């Protein structure tokens, strides 16, 4: 083998190892998270392993009907307060509803407002028409019979007939918020299913997906053993 040929092979190897792995697009990440194998249970385990922090929201954060949602967060914060002055409060909670990209998940946080509804049928219908993925509320929802009838995904900690109008003041939009005990930044990935809601920090998503693939492979090997041996201990 000539020296030129050797150098060519070495150079090729160096180029292969130097070529960075192409990052997944957000759409590709969402598509993988949508897989039935990727439940919020496994995702919660993966997020905690990758980040060292809890990613699952409060156990009382539940869907109005069984559904799975996956998308990127668009946030709004409201706080308790009566409008007793002449100041104008921008309707941030409505602005994000009218401007969020299709496929987004709205995250509404009602500070000290668990007993008042952040949304009802009108807002849910608007979200559905705008092709949003769903709404997550650290607070309450109302008109749930109508929302169930149109089958728009809403995850909420409580249900209440009380309106937020006159009780809650819009504070900000597209900021970091604490929702269900978990930090949510705009564009973080949100996954909700009948078990609850999990937040995946945007920059941790690919590492989480890699771990989820390992979980799936491991569980796929365990299930036949469980069925054959009728034992969980033998499968572990």
Tell me the role of every PLM-derived stretch.
Residues 1-3:
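N-terminal secretory signal peptides that target proteins for export/translocation
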Residues 6-17:
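Bacterial N-terminal signal peptides
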